């Protein structure tokens, strides 16, 4: 989640059960440390030819976490069905990487409204807040014991999801013509974990983009919930898992002992059930560079550049 430059690599798409390049499981020491240098002006500050921006502030119910949400609206008129809309976690880092070149590319299709949900900080990541907000309570150990220098409180995904769906989304969508059939959610690492948990727990969104979800940080039990899904409850939702093939010297796959078999079983069951899930492989990208590549791909997908999903539990897309 950490490299600040865009990557131009396009993913090779495969059905979700292809395991050859699946590297979801990681230990803390194998994650590159985040680039925590303070951020400068972003595209909202500089201005765009293709989008206009607004910023809204929110607080958590307990008053301990404070959010800054950027809403980017296309300068083009909304289609009759409304704009697609993509909610993006780690919004500070997203806004730091968003540029007019990508916005131009989106505008050539059906440009989405972009909602970057970040925190009230000048840093790219609020490490403590995201560790709490993005991790599921059911699988939580209350603190992130794999965090190295920190022991971060975890397990707040239900509270954050309620904030996102009942306060943030209604506020930012007010007055906009939104296509609710094309409302999506993207997240990377812990954010990817939140997206996967949200796919299981909520039908507020239709498209769920989970990039490099941190299943290996003690959250692999989430796979049991995935395995148990009833397909009829997921017919209207679409899940895309995005992962990079391990680069040379990246030995994350060596930590997958005892877990890869669970993933294999889970993905096979999903395939057999005909659930609308896909796996997108990004060759030669590690965990950090997947932040840029995956959020770009999610935006392009929801804008309609890539093949559209089709409803129906037995029609696998892509």
Segments the model singles out, each with a brief description of its role:
Residues 192-201:
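Short glycine-enriched nucleophile-adjacent loop
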Residues 216-281, 285:
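The feature captures the conserved acid-bearing segment of alpha/beta-hydrolase catalytic domains
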Residues 204-214:
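A conserved short beta-strand
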Residues 23-27:
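N-terminal signal peptide c-region/cleavage motif recognized by signal peptidases
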Residues 82-163, 167, 171:
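Serine-hydrolase catalytic machinery in alpha/beta-hydrolase-like enzymes
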Residues 28-83:
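A domain-start/cap signature at the N-terminus of enzymes
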């Amino acid at each position: 989640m950490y490299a600040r430059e865009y990557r131009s690599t396009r993913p090779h798409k495969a059905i979700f059960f292809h395991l050859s390049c699946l590297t979801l499981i990681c230990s803390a020491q194998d994650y590159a440390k985040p680039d925590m240098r303070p951020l400068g002006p972003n595209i909202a500050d500089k201005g765009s030819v293709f989008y206009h921006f607004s910023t809204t502030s929110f607080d958590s119910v307990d008053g301990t976490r404070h959010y800054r949400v950027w809403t980017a609206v296309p300068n083009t008129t909304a289609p009759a069905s409304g704009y697609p809309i993509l909610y993006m976690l780690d919004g500070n880092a997203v806004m730091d990487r968003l540029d007019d070149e990508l916005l131009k590319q989106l505008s050539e299709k059906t440009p989405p409204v972009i909602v970057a949900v970040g925190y009230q900080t000048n840093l790219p990541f609020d490490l403590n807040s995201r560790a709490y907000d993005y991790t599921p309570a059911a699988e939580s150990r209350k603190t992130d014991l794999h965090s190295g220098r920190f022991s971060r409180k975890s397990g707040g995904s239900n509270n954050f999801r309620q904030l996102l769906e009942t306060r943030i989304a209604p506020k930012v969508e007010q007055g906009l013509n939104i296509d609710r059939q094309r409302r999506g959610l993207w997240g990377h690492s812990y954010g990817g974990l939140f997206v996967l948990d949200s796919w299981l727990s909520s039908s507020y969104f239709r498209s769920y983009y989970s990039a490099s979800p941190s299943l290996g940080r003690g959250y692999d039990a989430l796979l049991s919930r995935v395995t148990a899904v009833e397909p009829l409850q997921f017919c209207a939702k679409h899940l895309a898992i995005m992962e990079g093939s391990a680069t040379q010297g990246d030995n994350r796959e060596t930590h997958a002992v005892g877990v890869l078999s669970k993933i294999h079983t889970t993905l096979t069951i999903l395939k057999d059930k005909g659930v609308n899930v896909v796996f997108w492989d990004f060759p030669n990208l590690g965990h950090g560079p997947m932040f840029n590549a995956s959020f770009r791909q999610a935006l392009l997908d929801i804008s309609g550049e890539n093949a559209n999903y089709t409803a129906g539990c037995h029609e696998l897309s892509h």
